[in-house]
């Protein structure tokens, strides 16, 4: 499975959706994408960051129950991250 399809495939939006970015030593670019996580309750929020090769950090998603919003374009070399929306 490619990184892009791993990030964008969601089998059931009422279950926990997970995303991961593996070390690919390359560039990944996306526009924006919002998906409903569903049944998470109110007031929950989080965000995920990528550690860039130059030491900076890039926020690659924000989550405010029940919506995940991806909006990013970044390059990376040896860093990765994974996250889940926290629905149980």
Swiss-Prot record:
Q: Where is the composition biased (Polar residues)?
A: 1-14
Cystine connections: none
Query: Which domain of life does the protein's organism represent?
Result: Eukaryota
Query: Positions of the region Disordered?
Result: 1-26
Note the Pfam families from the entry: Coiled
Q: Name one GO biological process term.
A: sorocarp development
Family per UniProt?
A: Belongs to the hssA/B family.
Q: What is this protein called?
A: HssA/B-like protein 9
Q: Which gene encodes it?
A: hssl9
